[in-house]
């Protein structure tokens, strides 16, 4: 396992990689958090977005439900019907139809980022 550069978030986080897999470890000292989640890459981000929005499952645990990260990747957060927090990832915001998804917020607008960090949500791309 190797530590890799990561973006800044509200709480301290360490990004680790092993092979083509990443794990992000958050450091919290307060009560059991409600932000524990699984992150998934999908083949059709826009279809997932439409389905989640239609079912009113979008979740603002992290301040907003759809963020563009500094590397151009996108994260969408929602709760499944059982209440589990799900993160859906997309590698390139430029490949999304902004008429379908018009509410993507820049992470850097909410959380200042460290300039020059060579981080990527997607490894080897």
Please provide the spans of the model-predicted regions.
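Vicinal oxygen chelate
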Residues: 38-85, 93-96, 111-125
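Short, compositionally biased
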Residues: 100-109
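Short acidic/glycine-enriched loop/turn segments that link adjacent beta-strands
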Residues: 8-12, 32, 69-74
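Conserved beta-strand in the GNAT
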Residues: 24-26, 87
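Short, solvent-exposed beta-strand edge segments and adjacent coil->beta transition regions
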Residues: 33-37
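Short, charged/polar surface micro-motifs in flexible loops or helix N-caps
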Residues: 19-22, 30-32, 43-48
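Core segments of cupin and vicinal oxygen chelate
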Residues: 1-22
